[in-house]
Curated annotation (Swiss-Prot):
UniProt function note: FABPs are thought to play a role in the intracellular transport of long-chain fatty acids and their acyl-CoA esters. FABPs are important elements related to the hibernating state in mammals.
Primary location: cytoplasm
Entry-annotated residues carrying Phosphothreonine: 8, 30
Pfam short name (any one): Lipocalin
Inducers of expression: Up-regulated during hibernation in brown adipose tissue.
Protein name per the record: Fatty acid-binding protein, heart
GO biological process, one term: hibernation
Keywords, alphabetical: Acetylation, Cytoplasm, Hibernation, Lipid-binding, Phosphoprotein, Transport
Any one of the GO CC terms: cytoplasm
Species of provenance: Ictidomys tridecemlineatus (Thirteen-lined ground squirrel)
Amino acid sequence: MVDAFVGTWKLVDSKNFDDYMKSLGVGFATRQVASMTKPTTIIEKNGDTIILKTQSTFKNTEISFQLGKEFDETTADDRKVKSTVTLDGGKLVHVQKWDGQETTLVRELNDGKLILTLTHGSVVCTRTYEKEA
């Protein structure tokens, strides 16, 4: 099922991203720059390992993980988190935990688009990606 997510995805729409970053404690200047960028997400699979790369003019990040196994992650806004990614009902569910806080990043496919729903407390952000040829 993970195979359906494999590919290169370009951001085409974003809703409530600034509020989401604000809830995480991201500073004003960083939020301004991050809000303007249109990142590309590259999802690859190598055996049991999934590689998720995010590339933009703001910052490039890369994580490698196996489903259901906790790993250390440094986020684009430099949070040091414990992350776990699972496959749940056709959705990739990525949970980040740090300092007693938790945020959830859910990736799902809908009409050929990758929908990323970010949740931190009561703040929900939706980012839509289209697959590049």
